[in-house]
Amino acid sequence: MTYLGRRDKRLAEIIRTIGPVERESWPDLFTALVSSIVSQQLSGKAADTIWRRVQERCGGEVTPRSLLAQDEAALRGCGLSARKVSYVRTIAREVASGALDLAELATLPDDAVCERLTALPGIGRWTAEMVLIFSLQRPDVVSFGDLAIHRGLRMVYRHRTIDRQRFERYRRRYAPYGSLASLYLWAVAGGACGLNDPAERTPKSRRP
């Protein structure tokens, strides 16, 4: 936090206002991948309900073996779409067969992890970057594809839009602690500081 505060005065103010931030970690990489697919395009409440059903169906622990023991109908009965069932079963088979070595991912650089994960069905760049932060505990990840990160940047730095060039400038400024900066940007986007989003300003009407 001290380093980020020295690098960026506005972020320093945010850090002082919010104080320490903590986020839930996903220590099991397979569980993180499957739960990420389960939650895609769902509200938090719906995703939690379906995930709980999947866990119960798998005997309380979602592993490649317990997941593959369930047929498609059983997983559909938990609330998963046919496409999501196909995704999670494919990933389970990849891990169970050894084609995907999850332990090896911890030894790879960030870009290589993203490349490996995005080759899996249902895993995009954003999901891979969240895995980097919350499962592999990588210290320097700021996701351009995260809408809340964009919102937090707009709110902190008073921009109407965040293009790639502007995003990269901030990302470089936060390095090598981009993941910590991400936590604060998410907190800001969630209303922790009471800032408004410049992108949501109502344009002033012109006089006739």
Indicate residue ranges for each PLM-predicted region.
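Active-site phosphate/pyrophosphate- and oxyanion-stabilizing loops and adjacent acidic/basic residues
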Residues: 36, 52, 115, 151, ...
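N-terminal alpha-helical segment
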Residues: 30-34, 47, 68-71, 109-113, ...
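Amphipathic alpha-helical segments that form the core helices of the histone-fold
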Residues: 33-37, 75, 171
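Alpha-helix N-cap and coil->helix boundary residues
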Residues: 25, 45-49, 62, 66, ...
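Alpha-helical ds-nucleic-acid-binding substructure associated with the helix-hairpin-helix region
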Residues: 10, 14, 42-121, 173
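Buried hydrophobic packing segments
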Residues: 34, 88-91, 153
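Alpha-helical scaffold segments that form or flank carboxylate-/histidine-based iron centers
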Residues: 26-41
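C-terminal accessory module of base-excision DNA glycosylases/AP lyases that mediates lesion recognition
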Residues: 1-21, 110-111, 125-208
